[in-house]
Design a protein with these regions (language model features):
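Alpha-helical transmembrane segments of multi-pass membrane proteins
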Residues: 1-236, 240
């Protein structure tokens, strides 16, 4: 939707990736703090509001009257238009993985002590969607059709999410067996630094490809695919874990 206005600018792609990574971090932070402070029972009501909020802006469409600046850097404009168009839906979706992991860990399902396999499932879905969209979806559906299909799919997803929430125990006082001591702040800072390194490399390599090789969106997805595939490998359970 933005390409007709911005063209094939690598700066626009990088701005979009910064936007989505920042909002993803915000969604994780929301899930962590709200579940910690409210517990599962009260969190359900807050999370229901968060997940229903995107319905107010669906189907996703380009706002009327918005056009990028003709002579200045479009980065700020790109961030603003993304916030208006997909800010609420993406923030809601960014909360799903950590929330589902918490619910799963507080359910009666086998393997609840290691809910991180859901990260692998989410990363696998991201890789499949990223690689299949240019070849299986975009050539056969217009933007309006895609927007409406996404809106209908999101509504169905909400129904499934509500069913999952009922499987989690309501008591926020229950503790997972084998819980470790909280990490120190020095450990947390190191973890954030380690996570920032591949993100910075992703942006830098993508910008280099766009500036020095070709300003071609299909090339830009290669670094992102490798980034997601690495996350998939890291979060997938190993044979030793299954033993």
């Amino acid at each position: 939707m933005l390409l007709p206005s911005l063209g094939g600018s690598p700066a626009a792609w990088n701005a979009a990736m910064v936007f989505f990574q920042t909002l993803l971090l915000a969604g994780y932070l929301y899930s962590h703090l709200s579940l910690k402070w409210l517990g599962i029972a009260r969190h359900r009501f807050l999370h229901a509001a968060v997940m229903l909020l995107p319905l107010l802006v669906l189907p996703i469409a380009m706002p009327a009257g918005w056009s990028p600046p003709a002579e200045s850097d479009p980065t700020i404009w790109t961030l603003l238009i993304l916030a208006v168009m997909v800010g609420a839906p993406y923030f809601a979706l960014s909360t799903v993985s950590p929330t589902l992991q918490h619910w799963f860990a507080h359910s009666d399902r086998p393997g609840k002590a290691e809910p991180y396999m859901l990260y692998a499932a989410g990363n696998a879905g991201s890789v499949i969607a990223l690689l299949s969209y240019p070849f299986l979806l975009e050539p056969f559906m217009g933007l309006k059709q895609q927007a409406w299909a996404w809106a209908v799919t999101y509504f169905g997803f909400l129904v499934l999410l509500a069913m999952c929430s009922l499987k989690a125990r309501s008591s926020h006082d229950e503790q997972i067996t084998g819980k470790e001591e909280p990490a120190s702040w020095s450990q947390r800072v190191r973890w954030m630094a380690y996570a920032a390194i591949p993100s910075v490399l992703l942006l830098g390599v993508t910008r280099h490809i766009g500036d020095e090789i070709a300003s071609f969106p299909l090339l830009w997805i290669i670094p992102l695919t490798l980034y997601l595939a690495t996350c998939l490998l890291y979060t997938s359970p190993s044979p030793r874990d299954e033993d």
